[in-house]
Amino acid sequence: MKLRGLIDEDFLNYKKPSMFLIFPYCTLKCDIENKMNVCQNSSLLKEPIIEINDVTLACRYFSNNITSSIVCGGLEPLDSFDDLLNFINLIRNEFRCNDDIVIYTGYTENEIKKELTELEKYVNIIVKFGRFIPNNDQHFDEILGCNLSSDNQYSKKIS
């Protein structure tokens, strides 16, 4: 899997201690729609892309007694959908682990219907939807247990 980084123990992006995977690509849809640079994660574009074996990454997660969920964010996980799906399949079917997997996406539900159909095949998948909109109010998301940056953003347990 290609990533821009990972955080072994993250306590900011989900209510449970998580391993945070920083996915490497994004179409910069927030910038395009706002006709200016608004991306909160644009600094990640300067980070080198690293390649890590899925099994190695999974074993790293399972060896940590603190974390109990995996959060996929960074730039845009759904712009690396094959890698994301392969990793989820490994966690669910090879390792037989049903810990929560949270996916932060800037896409709307309507834009990713096909991908959601694939993700719904796995248990305990939570998706945060919606692009960042500057000058919007933050709000607390009950499912994630943390604040989201724009009032159009929300999460949903899809399976």
What are these regions (language model features)?
Residues 11-52:
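Canonical Radical SAM [4Fe-4S] cluster-binding loop centered on the CxxxCxxC motif
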Residues 66-91, 133, 137-148:
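Conserved glycine-rich "GG(E/T)P / GGGxP" loop and the immediately following alpha-helix
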Residues 43-58, 78-121:
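Canonical radical SAM enzyme core domain
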Residues 1-11:
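N-terminal amphipathic/basic leader segments beginning at the initiator methionine
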Residues 22, 73, 102-106, 130:
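A cross-family glycoside hydrolase active-site/sugar-binding cleft signature
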Residues 68, 124-125:
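Conserved acidic residues
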Residues 14-15, 62-66, 121:
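Flexible, charged surface loops at secondary-structure boundaries
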Residues 113, 119, 125-159:
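Classical nucleotidyltransferase
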